[in-house]
């Protein structure tokens, strides 16, 4: 599915919608940015495969978890609606700039990004390097579509909002919430194509957990991120094209020449 973002400011203006039905002055506001993926997927009731990723709009996804608006105000921002395999550098830039723009709003306490799991770790790390705010930015997703038996997306989204609204999450960089655990964007990875515990923190483990609406942290990331990062996407519309090549026994050296002729580095 193609992504088109010719007019950034107009896209921002059209994308931001405040959910007014449960809006209460004085409560924290969490902006939920949706990009599609399994968490917004829809298919045959009870089936875990053969679904359409990104079928639910931002409003439909948020409405499917009514508990979200019980303690915080929700602002829905639809970035795109794609399978995470179709996420592009242009979408990354749009996402980072949207967060940076909205972070200037004092009413917004934090952000949640719903995302497909195949490239979630890449998007999380990109945002960790390019978002310019100490406000919590939390990515989450699902391994099963909303129409599946024992779907995991609703709880992940709810716990991500809990983490984004918690003041203890401020200044920790971009985070990922899955299966009750909170991971650093720098360490998070996907280790399974079907298990609901597929997202993990690798050798570093998790930073903390979400239990009964409460957020607990046990450690903090020490590497530079967000406001301390030197990367700035405010004035660019595309990323340099850099290929990553994997080599193996008897690999054809011509692969390097092919990639070099079609990339910036």
What kind of feature is each model-predicted range?
Residues 27-29, 33-34, 57-68, 184-265:
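Accessory alpha-helical/coil subdomains and C-terminal extensions
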Residues 34-40, 115-121, 181-183:
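Gly/Ser/Thr-rich loops at beta-strand to alpha-helix junctions
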Residues 139-212:
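Internal gly/pro-rich beta-alpha loop/helix module
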Residues 2-102:
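ATP/NTP phosphate-donor binding region
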Residues 105-120, 263-265:
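Short acidic, glycine-rich surface-loop motifs adjacent to enzyme active sites
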Residues 41-42, 118-124, 153-157:
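Short glycine/serine/threonine-rich phosphate/pyrophosphate-binding segments
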Residues 113-135:
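Short Gly/Thr/Asp-enriched flexible loops that form oxyanion-binding sites at enzyme active sites
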Residues 33-35, 113-115, 138-141, 173-179, ...:
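Short beta-strand segments
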């Amino acid at each position: 599915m193609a992504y088109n973002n010719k007019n950034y400011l107009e896209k921002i203006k059209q994308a931001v919608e405040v959910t007014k039905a449960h809006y209460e002055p004085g409560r924290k506001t969490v902006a939920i940015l949706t990009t599609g993926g399994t968490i917004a997927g829809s298919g045959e009731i009870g089936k875990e495969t053969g679904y359409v990723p990104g079928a639910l709009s931002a409003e439909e996804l948020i409405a499917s978890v009514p508990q979200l608006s019980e303690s915080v105000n929700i602002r829905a921002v639809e970035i795109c609606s794609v399978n995470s395999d179709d996420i592009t550098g242009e979408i990354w830039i749009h996402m980072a700039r949207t967060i940076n723009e909205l972070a200037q709003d004092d009413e917004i306490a934090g952000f949640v990004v719903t995302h497909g799991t195949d490239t979630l770790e890449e998007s999380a790390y990109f945002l960790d390097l390019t978002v310019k705010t100490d406000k919590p930015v939390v990515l989450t997703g699902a391994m099963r579509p909303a129409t599946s038996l024992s779907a995991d997306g609703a709880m992940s989204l709810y716990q991500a909002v809990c983490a984004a609204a918690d003041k203890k999450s401020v200044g920790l960089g971009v985070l990922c919430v899955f299966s009750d655990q909170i991971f650093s964007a720098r360490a998070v990875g996907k280790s399974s194509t079907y298990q609901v515990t597929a997202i993990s923190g690798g050798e570093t483990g998790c930073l903390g957990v979400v239990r009964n609406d409460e957020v607990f942290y046990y450690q903090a990331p020490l590497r530079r991120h967000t406001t301390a990062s030197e990367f700035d996407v405010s004035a660019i519309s595309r990323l340099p094209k850099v290929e990553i090549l994997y080599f193996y026994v008897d690999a054809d050296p011509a692969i390097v020449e092919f990639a070099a002729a079609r990339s910036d580095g």
